[in-house]
């Protein structure tokens, strides 16, 4: 039994060092300093006669590795010290290989208790149980190493790219969306003010060019203005842009003064209102169309009203002329044709009178 335990120790240490994850975990555990003492409940030990079998199943420290925490390695003949490793390694960190393998929650204790429970076990059964115990301990150590790597911040951030000192720093957030930068760009593009344009008086009302609250370069590319959507057929669907009340008020005030804008005027108005030049251009086109329709309707109404007034005045003048001719006294010596025409116009009203007059003339 002692020979088997002595042979299993180097085999287990060689198995631990042969796998890269366990070797890396073991070296990391050696580099750590003890932060707090590990307190574990002592492992249940069997009778004194089975101490050799339990010691053969317990792992031994790997060859050629120094003991972390300044602990002395156990002596070769001290088998009683191998039966209780948690008491001697109480000052070490709880993340070492020996601490992980000697925890009571691992299947090491159950595997170690099997040969100790049968006092009449043979050497072959103890060696097979020891090899199974070492395999299960290696699997448990690999799982613990993976869990520790996943729980540590370094393991979570290991896959992220790192920026070296040679890479340029990121630009400041106000470089691209800055009203001052947009103002400098606009002044550089259109250096002349609107009042200095040849042949044009200043057309903007005073509140536009004095930094109104809606004058912001970030408002020129808002998603709700001129955004493009897709309908059910997958075709591009242009939505109608929406403007604020202040923008519409400024556009209306400018349209009252001029119906057409030059290129620099349109650019400055678009910048002052936080709009694009195309939006201002389209708005003025639509506004001119609306104004033409309204003006044409007003002109048609005025013409119709004027025509009706002219007809009324013409009818009134004709009636006045007829009344003047009718009110003139009849001359007996005048032409009979004129008298006949006047009588024909008023024959309905004076039919009986004409009959009596003709009879009187015939009798005479």
From Swiss-Prot:
The modification Asymmetric dimethylarginine is found at residue 189. It is found in: Nucleus. It comes from the Eukaryota. Pancreatic beta cells. Pfam families: Homeodomain. Residues 306-364 are annotated as: Involved in DNA-binding. One of its GO terms (biological process) is glucose mediated signaling pathway. It comes from Mesocricetus auratus. Gene3D superfamilies: Homeodomain-like. Residues 236-295 bind DNA. One of its GO terms (molecular function) is RNA polymerase II-specific DNA-binding transcription factor binding. The lineage of its organism: Eukaryota, Metazoa, Chordata, Craniata, Vertebrata. Keywords: Activator, Developmental protein, DNA-binding, Homeobox, Methylation, Nucleus, Repressor, Transcription, Transcription regulation. One of its GO terms (cellular component) is nucleus. Residues 304-317 have a biased composition (Basic and acidic residues). Together with NKX2-2 and IRX3 acts to restrict the generation of motor neurons to the appropriate region of the neural tube. Belongs to the class II proteins of neuronal progenitor factors, which are induced by SHH signals. Transcription factor which binds to specific A/T-rich DNA sequences in the promoter regions of a number of genes. Involved in transcriptional regulation in islet beta cells. Binds to the insulin promoter and is involved in regulation of the insulin gene. InterPro entries: HD, HD_metazoa, Homeobox_CS, Homeobox_NK-like, Homeodomain-like_sf, HTH_motif. This is Homeobox protein Nkx-6.1. Residues 101-268 are annotated as: Repressor domain. Residues 48-92, 109-134 have a biased composition (Low complexity). Its main location: nucleus. The C-terminal domain contributes to sequence-specific DNA-binding. Residues 35-134, 294-364 are annotated as: Disordered.
């Amino acid at each position: 039994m002692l020979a088997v335990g002595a042979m299993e120790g180097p085999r287990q240490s060689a198995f631990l060092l042969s796998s890269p994850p366990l070797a890396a975990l073991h070296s990391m555990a050696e580099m750590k300093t003890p932060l707090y003492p590990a307190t574990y409940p002592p492992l249940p030990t069997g009778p004194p006669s089975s101490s050799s079998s339990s010691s053969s199943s317990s792992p031994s420290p790997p060859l050629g590795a120094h003991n972390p925490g300044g602990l002395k390695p156990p002596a070769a003949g001290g088998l009683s010290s191998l039966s209780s490793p948690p008491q001697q390694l109480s000052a070490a960190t709880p993340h070492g290989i020996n601490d992980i393998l000697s925890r009571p929650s691992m299947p090491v204790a159950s595997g170690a208790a099997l040969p100790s429970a049968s006092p009449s076990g043979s050497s072959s059964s103890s060696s097979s149980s020891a090899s199974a115990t070492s395999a299960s301990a290696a699997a448990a150590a690999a799982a613990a190493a993976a869990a520790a790597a996943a729980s540590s911040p370094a393991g979570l951030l290991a896959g992220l790219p790192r920026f070296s000192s040679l890479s340029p720093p990121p630009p400041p957030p106000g470089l691209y969306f800055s009203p001052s930068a947009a103002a400098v760009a606009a002044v550089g593009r259109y250096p002349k003010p609107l009042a200095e344009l040849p042949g044009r008086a200043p057309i903007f009302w005073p509140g536009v060019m004095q930094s109104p609250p809606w004058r912001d370069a970030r408002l020129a590319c808002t998603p709700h203005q001129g955004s493009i959507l897709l309908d059910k057929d997958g075709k591009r669907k242009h939505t109608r842009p929406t403007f604020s009340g202040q923008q519409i008020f400024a556009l209306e005030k400018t349209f009252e003064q001029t119906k057409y804008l030059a290129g620099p005027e349109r650019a400055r108005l678009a910048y002052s209102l936080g709009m694009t030049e195309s939006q201002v251009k389209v708005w003025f086109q639509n506004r001119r169309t609306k104004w033409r329709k309204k003006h044409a309707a007003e002109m048609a109404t005025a013409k119709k009203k004027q025509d009706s007034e002219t007809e009324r005045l013409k009818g009134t003048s004709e009636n006045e002329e007829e009344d003047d001719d009718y009110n003139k006294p009849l001359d007996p010596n005048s032409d009979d044709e004129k008298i006949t025409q006047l009588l024909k116009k008023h024959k309905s009203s004076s039919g009986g009178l004409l009959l009596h007059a003709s009879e009187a003339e015939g009798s005479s």
